[in-house]
Regions:
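Short coil/turn helix-boundary motifs
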Residues: 38, 67, 89-96, 114, ...
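Hydrophobic/aromatic-rich alpha-helical bundle segments in the mid-to-C-terminal region
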Residues: 129-137, 155-204, 215-216
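Amphipathic alpha-helical segments that line or abut small-molecule/effector binding pockets
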Residues: 29, 97-116, 168, 172, ...
Length: 216
């Protein structure tokens, strides 16, 4: 017997009162899975999400304005988790340089502990998500802003070498360094990394600030 193509999708009955939140969560979860499978926001469509959940496309629009809004919400939850992770790691660290180093280490640990969310945030094509890399969007990112503010504290405390006076530029450079290693560790787990990976990551957090911090 030949299967019908395209395959039919079992449709849900109309949601009862109180089920809307559960459906919204299912839609977000399906979108996240599609992002991971395709590696591109462009490849994710409202129709594909609807088929994955088992609803009609109009059901998606009752919860999200459009595809961009849907993908934004998927990313927003993970960005909030990253923001909280960095805040906890740097809490109580008085020296601003040590705090910045702690944030870099926390960023890498977050990526290694949560490789799939990390891929969604930083390693998929996401031109229509919060990661458009426009300055106005980037500055609104809470996790990035923590790094920028800490870099400014380092400047104000005279902890950086002369010439390093732009906290925004420094924060981008620091982010680029920690992201570089994190993305490699996530994308290339079979590479012969040092056996003591935790110590290696810890060392790298200090290397990221080499040449910037003033000698004491």
């Amino acid at each position: 017997m030949t299967a019908a193509y395209p395959p039919t999708v079992a449709r849900r009955t109309r949601a009862r009162k109180g089920e809307g939140a559960a459906l919204r969560a299912e839609i977000l979860a399906a979108t996240e899975r599609l992002l991971l499978e395709t590696g591109s926001a462009e490849a994710v469509s409202i129709r594909a999400v609807a088929e994955r959940v088992g609803v009609t496309p109009p059901s998606i629009y009752r919860h999200f304005a459009d595809k961009n809004d849907l993908i934004f919400e998927v990313c927003a939850g993970h960005f909030a988790a990253l923001d909280e992770f960095l805040a906890r790691a740097s809490e109580g660290v008085e020296d601003p340089v040590d705090r910045l180093r702690a944030m870099g280490l926390a960023y890498m640990r977050f990526g290694l502990a949560n490789p799939e969310p990390y891929r969604i945030l930083f390693m998929t094509r996401a031109d229509d998500t919060p990661e458009e890399y426009k300055a106005v969007v980037l500055r609104d990112n809470a996790a990035f802003d923590q790094v920028r503010r800490c870099a400014q504290e380092c400047i104000d405390a005279g902890r950086f070498r002369p010439g390093f006076t732009d906290a925004y530029r420094l924060a981008i450079g620091f982010w680029a360094r920690v992201h570089g290693l994190t993305s490699l560790l996530v994308a290339k787990p079979q590479f012969p990394w040092p056996d003591d990976r935790e110590a290696f990551v810890d060392e790298y957090a200090s290397i990221c600030l080499a040449g910037v911090v003033r000698d004491e």
